[in-house]
Amino acid sequence: MIIGIPKEIKNNENRVALTPAGAKELVKRGHTVYVQHTAGINSGFADDAYVAAGARILPSIEDVYGIAEMIVKVKEPIASEYPLVRKGQLVFTYFHFASDEALTLAMIKSGSICLAYETVENPDHTLPLLIPMSEVAGRMSVQEGARFLEKPQGGKGVLLGGVPGVKPGKVLVLGGGVVGHNAALMAAGLGADVTIADLSLPRLRYLSETMPKNVKTLFSSTHTIEQELPTTDLVIGAVLIPGAKAPHLITRDMLKLLKPGSVLVDVAIDQGGCFETSHPTTHANPVYEIDDILHYCVANIPGAVPQTSTLALTNATLPYVIKLADRGWEKACEEDPGLELGLNIVEGKIVYPAVAEAFPSLKA
């Protein structure tokens, strides 16, 4: 199979979808790998490393899309890439369709096969291609939130860990999955007073048993969230419904319960966001203020640490890339029901239920 690796062009997206080591594995199996010039440079991989692995370098993104049977990316195609995706081409990347009608419509019109990292499942229903980036995003959410709590950044001027004789800052984590777990661990490690809220009692029980002593658990409801907000400095939104839009757990009206200068970090923004007042931001302009509350809503948080996140991502994706290249998408999906769940749009038709539910009016 001919595999194309374009350079990511989303704002400050520094990851790359395939390392030279991954390219070497594919070439060894008889596949042809084309990599766009400097695609890996921000992750620490020069063109020469890909060439040494047996890949070929192409000068432009148009060249890569034009020749490849399978495009492997990190983030969804942006508007300038829509015309490059063609009928019958397999595109394997994070799509997050449910929060982006324009992208969904463009991929329907392209006639391509869209296989989404975020809905591929393991037999136990965990999400193997979402987990590594959720780990990174969860940890970074606290790192970034702590930074914007600083007064020069517009925050209230709180040090999350406190100091002897001064209370630590308070962090509320909404969602106890992979993102929430990692966010709570990071916040706890800084010495913050952490509360993690979730709807699953078994999950809360597990977290209560395994988390550090400065992490408390809370059954999530509008009432319990409202009770927590007046004393909270940093809120991490970490809810996930696979493939679907995130629910709004904090409304505009609830912002008045927070003290001015508090920070909301919405890790669920790539699925539409879990705060009513959220809209996507970029690493170049990461925050905005509504009702004196800072909102950090960067949709590609791990893109800021590519030398960590590229390796974490490609460790997980490479076995699937090899399977798709070796068997073709139809045979590979037939043999692996978990991979088949990654199919979101196939040749003009929405095939993933949560995406179809998000856009009932879209027709092929």
Question: Where do the PLM segments sit?
Answer:
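Glycine/serine-rich phosphate-binding loop and adjoining beta1-alpha1 elements at the start
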Residues: I2, E8, P77-G169, V298-N300
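An N-terminal-biased, well-structured beta-alpha scaffold segment characteristic
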Residues: I2-A106, S110
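Adenosine-phosphate binding glycine-rich loop
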Residues: E118-L159, I269, C274-A364
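Glycine-rich phosphate/diphosphate-binding loop of Rossmann-like nucleotide-binding domains
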Residues: P6-F45, P152-L240, V287
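Short glycine-/small-residue-rich Rossmann-like dinucleotide-binding loops
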Residues: E69, K75-E76, F95-H96, S221, ...
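Rossmann-like adenosine-cofactor binding region
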Residues: E209-D291
